[in-house]
Amino acid sequence: MKAIFITLEGPDGSGKTTVGTLLNQKMEEAGIDFIKTREPGGSPISEKVRNIVLGIGNEEMDPKTEVLLIAGARRQHVVETIRPALAAGKTVLCDRFMDSSLAYQGAGRDMNMEQVLQVNLYAIEDTIPDRTYYLDVPAEVGLARIAANKGREVNRLDKEDITYHEKVQNGYEKIIQMFPDRFMRVDATKTPEEITTIILADILKQLT
């Protein structure tokens, strides 16, 4: 069984974290040798940057600062966690990666998406996901889920208005057009269990 780099993407409230937890369990049951990680974060240094980028109280952060901080954290994550796992023959399951920067900072902050892409390609070099699962849910549905989930950790980006989240969603649509072979769109209005079953079936195909 080969090792591949898998990422989960989607707007806030898409159920991505819940699906990631279920997928972790099902991949273990399937006997897949893998690690699960996340962004921003995924390594000790990168987790420190995560706290800065997502921290409540940092609302005055300049958009370009946000891009560069996340790209720096991503570089450290790639070097310290992702590449070593792949080199050891382990599949990597990552909650968010560079596509989140293109959607949230590029599209969401009205920045040049091509420039954001180039910054991230500089950071990750050839460590590009083999397969990306996009959990597709309308922005208003996602925000309603966040509001209803009282136990969820609220971060700085959750406090953005509906217009920002719609821009993020439009950004994802552009990214899917840029990398159609890498993306698989999954209807995130389905239950987490249904979504997990769909994704796991495709992962098993990718690994054979």
Swiss-Prot record:
Q: What Gene Ontology terms describe what this protein does at the molecular function level?
A: ATP binding; dTMP kinase activity
* Superkingdom in the source lineage: Bacteria
Query: Catalytic activity, per the record?
Result: dTMP + ATP = dTDP + ADP
One GO cellular component this record assigns the protein to is: cytosol
Q: Which InterPro entries match?
A: P-loop_NTPase, Thymidylate_kin-like_dom, Thymidylate_kin_CS, Thymidylate_kinase
Binding residues for ATP, per the UniProt record? 10-17
| Root EC class | transferase
- Which EC number(s) are documented for this chain? 2.7.4.9
A Pfam family of the record is: Thymidylate_kin
Tell me, which GO biological process terms does this entry list?
dTDP biosynthetic process; dTTP biosynthetic process; dUDP biosynthetic process
Q: Which UniProt keywords apply?
A: ATP-binding, Kinase, Nucleotide biosynthesis, Nucleotide-binding, Transferase
> Which family does the UniProt entry place this protein in?
Belongs to the thymidylate kinase family.
User: What does the UniProt function comment say about this protein?
Assistant: Phosphorylation of dTMP to form dTDP in both de novo and salvage pathways of dTTP synthesis.
Q: What is this protein called?
A: Thymidylate kinase
